[in-house]
Structures are given as structure tokens and as C-alpha cells.
């Protein structure tokens, strides 16, 4: 649910804190995605399109969330976006009342839905269908399995996914939180993205926490008080208090206890809610936990086709697209790396997007330090040894169906066009520096081959005339284009 009425209030009071984005504009960014919220959106989208039915496999298990997850992850990778899916665990005790209330609301909605279906009232069905959906444990587990087979990072929250997402942003492991729940902001997430899991026709909304604080003229502690008074999942609300009244009360009293006592509420409940927002229980992760892994084509085929009855032809096309997007990304990244020197002596572009403030700039209590924090160190046991960043991972972890080490090695000429282009640009940059070199030295350029040893993450330069391995590449005598590429690749993998 999040904070009641927060977005409409901010749209009116601090419109500059909310902006619209396209999915393409997030290229190169990493998103901490609230998995439960995303799976809910995927399921709703399928059920909305058919009024009340879901996609199911031969066992009668819902697969709507799998279908939605496949499509959205495909888009993320196509645009060079790194998704990190964060899954809820056991909810905190403070949320018990809220969860019970939601259960009762679902039961009532189910009864109304059955009646609307029997009467053929399609409009009522469409309104009610979303209220009956619940993301089950089985749906979460199947989603995790799919993501891992795709090489997409999976993070397990200690309790609330929103708090864990905010932690990842606070620790600079991800740039944005993608969720429909606005309490992510109250947990300290610097940037909240909404509608990320919705259809591509919907604009993504970005909420900037620092701009919210500046516009409301609140410090972070006052913002928490304001949001709790608006209504959250962890305590009851005060009668007659919405966002506008809450804003006025915080401005006047600037103290949550005084406000609650003035309105005749139980401050202990509000105090516990505030303490949880300031010090939620989260698992500790490092950068290895959010790195993209390898795609498992065989595992994906078995899971999607055999276990969940997806079309084999469509699954093959899906896997082909995933591999294509990863290859495209590495080519772009490698080319940028090799041609970077030509920009060294130029002024920086005035259009470059400035780095936005971190959550730490506005949150007084940070995860992992200070009194009352609840950080539990989590080993990244789900991450394989060869799972590394997108750019490096495609260099050293290309999927292979063979156990033979020889088959795991790839030659540069597989990307011949890329290296020719890079070589020409590099030689143009260096031509003045090396124009005095002899023709004999230049001829060596045609007799060198670069090989990758994927298992050991090494780059090898070979003299084709006598198959001898060249152990060094002299950076001061680099008239050979392939020697230059070798030199940069050595720098890349160190």
C-alpha cells in the first residue's frame, strides 16, 4: 500500500519532485525492484486483458507472472538496464493488523467477483479482479528460479522488500528503487520509480526524495512523522488526518508525540512504526550479489517448456533475444573502452547528467551503523564464481554446451567487425606518435592473434608465424593495433 495519498499530495504541493521518464532513458542504470509488487502488476495485466482468467500450466498453476517477468526482463536487457529483484521474507509483527485487513478485503472482493461473473457484469469484473490477486509463495519461488536461469540477480530480504531495496540504494549497489509502494521513500530510498513493471505505454514516474524534503521544508525525521500521520502499514491512523492535515500538524508542532497526544491517539504504536522506518531489519549484501550471471539456455528450456508448457518455438526466440542483447551490450561497452583516449583532452560535455544526491544526504540513520540498526550479513551463496558485470561477464563467461576447455575459448575474429573498427580508430589516435616506426614493425600487425581463456580470465597474444605466445605488450612501442587492444584488455581484467 505504501503511504496513503502521498503521490497526489506531492503532485500538488511539490510538483518538481516528480518527473516522467521513459524506460529507454534508464539505459546503463541498475534498479532494485520490489519483486512482489512487480509480480502483482504482471498478474493483474494478464487478468485485466481476459477479465478474470490467468495463464496456467498443465498442473493448474498460474504462469501469468512468469510470462510478465520474461517480457519485462527482456525489455530491461534490451535497453541495457540491470534489474535486481528483491523478494519479501517474513513480514514484521507491526504489519499483522494490516495483513489481516487485506485478507478480509480479498475475501469480500472474491465474493463480489463471483457475483459479477455470474451476472456477466464485465465492468465490475474488471474493477474487482485486482483486489483478489495475492502473490503466493509458489509464485515467488518460480519467479526466483526463472530469474536465476536468466542470470538476473535475486536478493532475499530479511523482512520487507521495500526496506531491502532502500538499503541497496543507500549502499550504492543500485541506483533506483522500482516499486509501487511509496514507503520506500520513508525507508530512505533516494529515488523511487513507479510503473516500471507496467506496460510500455505508461510513463515511468520518478520521485526524488531530496526534492521532496526541500519542497516541503522538512528534515528526514519530520518527513517520517508526516508519512506516518498520512497512514502506513505499521500503525493505525488518526481520525480525520490526511496528507494536508498531517502537513499542517508537522509544521505546527514539529513533534510526532505532541501531535498524537493532541489528537488522542496511542503514541506507542506510532513510536514503534517510526523506529521501524528508521531501523528496519535488512540483510547485508555486497557488489558481488548484484552482478549479472550467465544465461542457462538448457535450464530455461526445461523450466519454461517442460515444466510450464510454454511454446518451445517462442522460448527459443526468447533465449536468442537474451543472448543477442548481452552480445550487443558488450560490443558497445568494449568499443567505448578502447576508444576512450580520444576524449581525454576534450572539455566535458555540458549535457552530461550530473550525479544525483545519495539517500545518505538526507537520512540521519544509515544501515549498518549506529544504534538500533538491524543489518544481518548475507553470504552471496546464490552467485556463481563466474558471475561478473555485464561487460566483463560476456567476455569471460560466454555460454557453452561443451565441457572441453578448448571449446570455451573464443577468438577475437568472432567480433571481427568490432575489432577492425576499434583498431582503425586506435591507430588514427596513435598515428602521430608512431609514424616513425619501420614498415617491418607495422607488418607484425598481421601476424598477431588475440585469444581469450574464459576459465582463467586471461588474454593471450599469439604470434601466428611460429605459434609462440607473446608474454608482453610494450605500451611504448604499440604500433601494432592488436597489441594495443591486448594491452587495454589486460588493464580491463585486472
Swiss-Prot record:
InterPro entries attached to this UniProt entry: 5-3_exonuclease (IPR002421), 5-3_exonuclease_C_sf (IPR036279), Flap_endonuc (IPR023426), HhH2 (IPR008918), PIN-like_dom_sf (IPR029060), XPG-I_dom (IPR006086), XPG/Rad2 (IPR006084), XPG_DNA_repair_N (IPR006085)
Principal location: nucleus
Enzyme Commission designation: 3.1.-.-
UniProt region (N-domain), positions on chain: 1-106
Ranges for region Disordered: 341-382, 395-426
Subcellular location: Nucleus, Nucleolus; Nucleus, Nucleoplasm; Mitochondrion
Binding site for DNA: 47, 72, 160, 231, 233
Required cofactor(s): Mg(2+)
Residue numbers spanned by region Interaction with PCNA: 330-338
Keywords attached to this entry: DNA damage, DNA repair, DNA replication, Endonuclease, Exonuclease, Hydrolase, Magnesium, Metal-binding, Mitochondrion, Nuclease, Nucleus, Phosphoprotein
SMART domains in UniProt: 53EXOc, HhH2, XPGI, XPGN
Cofactor note: Binds 2 magnesium ions per subunit. They probably participate in the reaction catalyzed by the enzyme. May bind an additional third magnesium ion after substrate binding.
Post-translational modification: Phosphorylated. Phosphorylation upon DNA damage induces relocalization to the nuclear plasma.
Region spans: I-domain: 124-253
Entry GO MF terms: 5'-3' exonuclease activity; 5'-flap endonuclease activity; DNA binding; magnesium ion binding
Function: Structure-specific nuclease with 5'-flap endonuclease and 5'-3' exonuclease activities involved in DNA replication and repair. During DNA replication, cleaves the 5'-overhanging flap structure that is generated by displacement synthesis when DNA polymerase encounters the 5'-end of a downstream Okazaki fragment. It enters the flap from the 5'-end and then tracks to cleave the flap base, leaving a nick for ligation. Also involved in the long patch base excision repair (LP-BER) pathway, by cleaving within the apurinic/apyrimidinic (AP) site-terminated flap.
Protein name, UniProt field: Flap endonuclease 1
Amino acid at each position: 500500500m505504501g503511504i496513503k495519498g502521498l503521490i497526489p499530495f506531492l503532485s500538488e504541493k511539490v510538483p518538481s519532485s516528480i518527473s516522467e521518464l521513459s524506460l529507454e532513458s534508464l539505459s546503463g542504470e541498475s534498479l532494485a525492484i520490489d519483486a512482489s509488487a512487480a509480480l502483482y502488476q504482471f498478474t493483474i495485466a494478464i487478468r485485466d486483458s481476459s477479465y478474470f482468467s490467468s495463464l496456467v500450466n498443465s498442473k493448474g498453476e498460474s504462469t501469468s507472472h512468469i510470462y510478465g517477468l520474461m517480457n519485462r526482463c527482456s525489455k530491461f536487457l534490451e535497453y541495457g538496464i540491470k534489474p535486481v529483484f528483491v523478494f519479501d521474507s517474513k513480514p514484521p509483527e507491526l504489519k499483522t493488523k494490516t495483513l489481516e485487513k487485506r485478507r478480509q478485503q480479498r475475501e469480500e472482493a472474491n465474493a463480489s467477483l463471483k457475483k459479477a461473473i455470474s451476472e456477466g457484469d464485465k465492468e465490475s469484473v474488471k474493477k474487482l479482479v485486482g483486489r483478489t490477486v495475492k502473490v503466493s509463495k509458489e509464485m515467488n519461488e518460480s519467479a526466483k528460479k526463472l530469474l536465476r536461469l536468466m542470470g538476473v540477480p535475486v536478493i532475499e530480504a530479511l523482512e520487507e522488500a521495500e526496506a531491502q531495496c532502500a538499503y541497496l540504494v543507500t549502499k550504492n549497489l543500485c541506483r533506483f528503487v522500482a516499486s509501487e509502494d511509496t514507503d520506500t521513500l520513508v525507508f530512505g530510498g533516494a529515488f523511487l520509480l513507479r510503473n516500471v513493471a507496467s506496460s510500455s505505454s505508461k510513463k515511468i514516474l520518478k520521485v526524488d526524495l531530496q526534492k521532496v524534503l526541500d519542497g516541503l521544508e522538512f528534515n528526514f525525521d519530520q518527513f517520517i512523522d508526516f508519512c506516518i500521520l498520512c497512514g502506513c502499514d505499521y500503525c493505525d491512523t488518526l481520525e480525520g488526518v490526511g496528507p494536508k492535515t498531517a502537513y499542517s500538524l508537522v509544521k505546527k508542532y514539529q513533534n510526532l508525540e505532541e501531535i498524537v497526544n493532541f489528537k488522542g491517539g496511542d503514541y506507542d504504536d506510532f513510536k514503534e512504526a517510526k523506529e521501524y522506518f528508521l531501523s528496519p531489519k535488512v540483510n547485508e549484501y555486497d557488489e558481488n550479489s548484484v552482478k549479472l550471471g550467465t544465461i542457462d539456455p538448457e535450464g530455461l528450456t526445461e523450466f519454461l517448456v517442460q515444466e510450464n508448457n510454454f511454446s518451445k518455438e517462442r522460448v527459443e526466440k526468447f533465449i536468442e533475444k537474451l543472448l543477442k542483447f548481452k552480445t550487443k551490450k558488450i560490443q558497445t561497452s568494449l568499443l567505448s573502452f578502447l576508444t576512450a583516449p580520444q576524449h581525454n583532452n576534450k572539455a566535458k560535455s555540458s549535457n552530461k547528467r550530473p550525479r544525483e544526491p545519495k539517500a545518505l544526504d538526507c537520512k540521519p540513520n544509515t544501515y549498518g551503523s549506529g544504534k538500533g540498526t538491524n543489518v544481518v550479513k548475507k553470504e552471496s551463496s546464490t552467485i556463481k564464481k563466474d558471475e561478473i558485470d555485464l561487460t566483463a561477464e560476456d567476455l569471460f563467461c560466454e555460454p557453452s554446451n561443451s565441457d572441453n576447455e578448448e571449446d570455451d575459448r573464443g577468438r577475437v575474429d568472432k567480433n571481427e567487425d568490432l575489432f577492425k573498427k576499434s583498431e582503425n580508430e586506435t591507430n588514427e589516435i596513435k598515428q602521430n606518435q608512431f609514424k616513425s616506426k619501420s614498415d617491418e614493425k607495422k607488418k607484425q600487425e598481421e601476424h598477431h592473434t588475440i585469444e581469450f581463456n574464459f576459465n582463467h580470465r586471461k588474454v593471450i597474444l599469439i604470434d601466428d608465424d611460429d605459434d609462440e605466445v607473446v608474454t608482453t605488450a610494450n605500451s611504448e612501442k604499440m604500433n601494432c593495433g592488436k597489441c594495443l587492444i591486448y594491452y587495454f584488455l589486460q588493464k580491463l581484467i585486472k
